[in-house]
Amino acid sequence: MKIGRFFESGRVMYRQWGKYELLVDTPHYRVKHVVIQPGKTIFAHKHVFRSEHWTIVSGTAFIELDGKEGLYYTDDVVDVLPGKTHQVTNAGDTELVIVEVSVGENVSEDDKVSTDVASDNLNSKKLVSESIVYLNPAFKDNLWGGNKLKELYGKKCDFDILAESWEMSAHESGQSIVASGRHKGMLFNDYLGTIGKDNWGWKCSTFADFPILVKLIDAKDKLSVQVHPDDDYAIANENQYGKNEVWYVIDCEPDSYLYCGFNRDVSREEVLQRIEDDSILDVLNKIPVQKGDVYFIKAGTVHAIGAGIVICEIQQSSNCTYRLYDFNRRDKFGDLRELHIDKALDVLNFSKYCPEKINEGIVDGEGFKKRIISQCKYFECTLVDIDSAARILGVEESFTSFLVLEGEGRISVRSINEPDKVKDSISFKAGDSFFAPKSTDIFMIEGQSKIIMTRV
């Protein structure tokens, strides 16, 4: 009997849904540290003699309380009064941590009345309520950046330098944040876990992580001469995807240029020597750029963005970059920036590279034009130039990213079976970024604008 009572009142208790730890335990006041595993549920019950006060420490909770339901996030607070039926589910893909404070005549486990309305089917909760969500970016202050992203797009950033704006990113180095709808405030990767991989589209089924990153780049100064690895090397050595990318030139100063590929065959030894004697630029293709130019940068291709260029970059979701040469620049602490020469030499393509601007055909629509600017195994990017309105069909195979480069207007989402009924509607301006899960909906885009649309 004594042993049984010890286990019933132990400091840490394990349950089918996770565990809790008693931090404070008195007859009328109890504090618990509750951990619920992803997808698990504390099923519906109520208390007669106590109230509970929950604070979400981390994770995403789907809570049903007294006939109402909703999503709750970090720092949200929930009060559960005596006699009110409640149920909590971990709706994310990481542990849900709650601090629970109980106050009342009886705060023990005896004061718990189970009900018959429990459900463990997350899908039945219809957690995906919006057909499209607005994303706030993550910002980067690399030393070569400027402030054109603030000037062109009104990016609200306190950094003195705004080099990059990661518009759609689930990467751990910088995540976007959902900024509209019932998931507002969630980190993008948490949101993706909440809606489930099925809603990314079937082309994403083989990916362990979300596959695409979309960013804006302001190169006030030149970037380092660098190279990205392919998937095989990056997964083996960096535990992340490789990096193939496409550049769309949004704006540039006169006589701007970039470097892409070697202008002749070179050897590993020659590249190493030219890094040491500061002559590596002599064997790179120097390419003048104009607004609207598009370049695909295949993994293994040496490259560098020149000064005075604003670019939209669509890439694999990777932050894997190996610097070969950085013009002997020093960081804000006065130290030479790190180079990654050995790894760069491992992945470089030393053959002559013949750069080509991507110039796919333009398809005329009613009130708009479409131009495919990249189509590869990793992503498909389409520039939609809208004069008045565009009708874009959603697809089952992929999510859709919308990045507004110019103009303003509104995106209305309509069911293909009920095209006169608006499911969701959201306004936009230049610099805005949106994510739409897979669907067969119709996206009606109204307003003169220019938008890059990305799918897998």
Feature locations, PLM:
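Short histidine-centered beta-strand/loop micro-motifs
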Residues: 22-25, 33-34, 42-47, 55, ...
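Ligand-binding loop in jelly-roll beta-barrel domains
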Residues: 26-27, 73-74, 82-112, 217-222, ...
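Glycine- and acidic-residue-biased ligand/ion/polar-headgroup-sensing regions
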Residues: 49-67, 179-181, 191-195, 219-222, ...
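Acidic/His-leaning functional-site neighborhoods
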Residues: 358-432
